[in-house]
Swiss-Prot record:
It comes from Aucuba japonica. Usually encoded in the trnK tRNA gene intron. Probably assists in splicing its own and other chloroplast group II introns. One of its GO terms (biological process) is RNA splicing. Keywords: Chloroplast, mRNA processing, Plastid, RNA-binding, tRNA processing. Pfam families: Intron_maturas2, MatK_N. This is Maturase K. Belongs to the intron maturase 2 family. MatK subfamily. It is found in: Plastid, Chloroplast. InterPro entries: Domain_X, Maturase_MatK, Maturase_MatK_N. GO terms for cellular component: chloroplast. GO terms for molecular function: RNA binding.
Length: 504
């Protein structure tokens, strides 16, 4: 963002209204390829000899100044051969540069909001692990959860209409329409595991930006409506006692009105609604009843249809009780379970045993989906039996061990918040034995021989994962096996979900 502020010496109104001329600036394409202001080589194409250098960027800008060169007829035999051969390359470059340009208004709003709230270190807020401490603090007091998938637009014009509220430049919107109708692969970009064309693989930044803008517009309206419908707003710690007394008044009102107005009881209850989203999946949890959650379910369906013309099937929204069901979110199976405890109370010569049950938020590693992900990556079969992976002959044994160990450390780092570490131990066992089978396949030897020769080294590589990432949190723990049974630890440096853990 510093590069934007350095080069874009325009006030905010100009940046909102005149974004299209920036498509003719060379530094935009340098920023699009994350090379800062390095003007040497911007992109290596997956083709045979195509390289997008500064010369190609200048050639592209010259052609864009000419008329009718952005839209090329398919059956035009008189078109320039060089432009026809590089049509996909030019289109890719323009779309990536355009993605950088349309992100400018959103980036400026983000900087202004962070400066207004005096948030100096905002990187910790980006960690996806910061969601789980929020779950621990709030979900143990809630009853029901809505597990839903956010629908995506079925018509590309809806994306353009949504972006009109943020980008006021008509020329930029017309260019956006050109890309959207030129490459009709929106559904494949929502699920990037099944890309339908090479363009979708290389130009996901633009389509991810459009999807995030669509979700941002939906959430801004949705949060506003939730705040308007909530009777009890979140208060600061100074008014905490007043809120406790108000809860007591609510319970008294419920007892009074229970006999006369049983239908309107839910109006006096604080719904205490919480909303969390990651990618296309969102969670809504409430302290209310199942009737209230059903009302929210059909309200969301009507909200998507009326305001955004999106059809969402009721079967895509599940209502589960937290005490009886677990929900799959960000690679964890999360639930609220009762932790029974017995307390002995003694008064004078009499003693009493009091059964007490405390709600506790529980997170476990889903072993079956993880084994399925490892099977797709060819680390094991569908039953979890480790197999060897084909590797290049020029890789050394230390490189192979380091690659397997890095994967194992990433697993341990991401799933450090699991309540039960035995599933994580099984994943490590699969990776360790798969590494041994890979080495044995390379040297055309037996697995027992390599386990006997490299047993201690493999053991240190695969079981020292927590010791390397937790040296300050648990300095007294020395045994490598004790790391498998530690408590939950959440990190603030994880910005994306593990690829093998993203089994949804």
């Amino acid at each position: 963002m510093e590069e934007f502020q350095r080069y874009l010496q325009l006030d905010r109104s100009q940046q909102h209204d005149f974004l299209y001329p920036l498509i003719f600036q060379e530094y935009i394409y340098a920023l699009a390829h994350d090379h800062g202001l390095n003007r040497s080589i911007l992109l290596k194409n997956t083709g045979s000899d195509n390289k997008s250098s500064l010369l190609i960027v200048k050639r592209l800008i010259i052609r864009m100044y000419q008329q009718n060169h952005l839209i090329i007829p398919v059956n035009d035999s008189n078109q320039n051969q060089l432009f026809g051969r590089n049509k996909n390359l030019y289109s890719q470059m323009i779309s990536e540069g355009f993605a950088v340009i349309v992100e400018i208004p959103f980036s400026l709003r983000l900087i202004a909001s962070l400066a207004g709230k005096e948030i100096v270190k905002s990187h910790n807020l980006r960690s996806i692990h910061s969601i789980f401490p929020f779950f621990e603090n709030n979900f143990s007091h809630l009853n029901y959860v809505l597990d839903m998938l956010i629908p995506h637009p079925v018509h590309l014009e809806i994306l353009v209409q949504t972006l009109r509220y943020w980008v006021k430049d008509a020329s930029s919107l017309h260019l956006l329409r050109f890309f959207l109708y030129e490459y009709r692969n929106w559904n494949s970009l929502i699920t990037p595991k099944k890309p339908s064309s090479s363009f979708s693989k290389k130009n996901q930044r633009l389509f991810f930006f459009l999807y995030n803008a669509h979700v941002c517009e939906y959430e801004s309206i949705f949060v506003f409506l939730c705040n308007q419908s909530s009777y009890l707003r979140s208060t600061s710690s100074e008014a905490f006692l007043e809120r406790i007394y108000f809860y007591g008044k609510i319970e008294c009102l419920v007892e009074v009105f229970a006999k006369v107005f049983p239908v309107n009881l839910w109006l006096f209850k604080d719904p205490n609604m919480h909303y969390v989203r990651y990618q296309g999946k969102s969670i809504m949890a409430s302290k209310g009843t199942s009737l209230l959650m059903n009302k929210w379910k059909y309200y969301l369906i009507n909200f998507w249809q009326c305001h955004f013309y999106l059809w969402s099937h009721p079967g895509r929204i599940y209502i589960n009780q937290l005490s009886n069901h677990s929900f799959d979110f960000m690679g964890y199976f999360s639930s609220v379970r009762l932790n029974p405890s017995m307390v002995r109370s003694q008064m004078l010569e009499n003693s009493f045993l009091i059964d007490n049950a405390i709600k506790k938020f529980d997170t476990i590693v889903p072993i079956i989906p993880l084994i399925g992900s490892l099977a797709k990556a060819k680390f094991c079969n569908v039953l979890g039996y480790p197999i060897s992976k084909p590797v290049r002959a020029d890789l050394s044994d230390s490189d192979i061990i380091d690659r397997f160990g890095r994967i194992c450390r990433n697993f341990s780092h991401y799933h450090s918040g699991s309540s039960k570490k035995k599933s994580l131990y099984r994943i490590k066992y699969i990776l360790r034995l798969s590494c041994a089978r890979t080495l044995a396949r390379k040297h055309k030897s037996s697995v027992r021989f390599f386990l006997k020769r490299l047993g201690s080294e493999l053991l240190e590589e695969f079981f020292m994962a927590e010791e390397q990432v937790l040296p300050l949190t648990f300095p007294r723990v020395s045994s490598t096996f004790q790391g498998l049974y530690r408590g939950r630890v959440w990190y603030l440096d994880i910005f994306c979900i593990n690829d093998l853990a993203n089994h949804e």
